[in-house]
Amino acid sequence: MSPIPKELPAPPAHAPAYWAEACKHLVKKDRVMRRLIPQYSAEALQTRGDPFITLARSIVGQQVSVKSASATWKRFSALLTDLTPANVLLLKVDDMRGAGLSARKVDYLVDLALHFTEDRLHVQDWERMDDEAIIAELTAIRGI
């Protein structure tokens, strides 16, 4: 097993605020990450957009190949010029099904959109919330 490094390189400028602490924790707790984090220290997660789109993409991509998820996402997102929770709620189920979404995934996307439009998620507070509170909010959404 590789030894725990005494100090990790500084995170890249584009890294989220929590990145250095998360890397430090993972290096201590996971033997694979202990080797990978120093090796890829110039890398960091970056946001791919707003939380609604990120979660919607996650739902679309569940239990399918990356290629299939990408094709389905492309067809689904083409249904709208502006992919927002409110606009998703305006879509017809048949149109979403025609984009390649299963009935269950349509239900999940509608529930996700409802959580956003009804302000049941406190996205703006997530950075200050503890993990358990965020998990509770997210797992209240069907399909998450």
Which residue stretches match the model-derived regions?
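Amphipathic alpha-helical segments that form the core helices of the histone-fold
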Residues: 55-57, 96
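Alpha-helical ds-nucleic-acid-binding substructure associated with the helix-hairpin-helix region
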Residues: 64-65, 69-142
